[in-house]
Amino acid sequence: MINHKPISKKNIFKILKNLKKFNLKTEWHNLNQSNELIIAQDIISKINLPPFNNSAVDGYAILNNDIKKNKELFYNRRVAAGDNIKLKIKKGEAIRIFTGAKMPLNSNTVVMQENTKTNNNKVLIKKAPKIGSNCRIMGEDIKKNTIILKKGT
């Protein structure tokens, strides 16, 4: 009886990769069914993730410069997650926004609702955030046309 030493999975893959005449067949699999398979080609993102600028918290979308002069802003509009909007914030205005909602086009900061106090159609900013706070920027997780899974892995 021949006694062969076992080869690790890692070494088997190295050996197979180095065989020039070895022709690997490619198949399409769902990611959750691809355990222990090798990726035949780079997988490239077709979209940005997130696909648009959105709020990371419930609160108020603002123009950060507005709160340097006045901590109280007018509000009468709101944006919820799933709303497909193209709003712009006016000077001195805040827009009520919810987690995952698309940011107004020119807004650059979201104030967490816990740091505000409302009275009628006015919102008082109790704690001013830094510019860009509580915003998820389009493509910050994955940029369109970038490799997300590399061939051979």
Identify the role of each PLM range.
Residues M1-K69, N121:
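Short, low-complexity N-terminal leaders and the immediately following helix N-cap/first helix
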Residues I2-N3, Y60-T153:
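Short, glycine/charged-enriched hinge/interface segments at domain edges or termini
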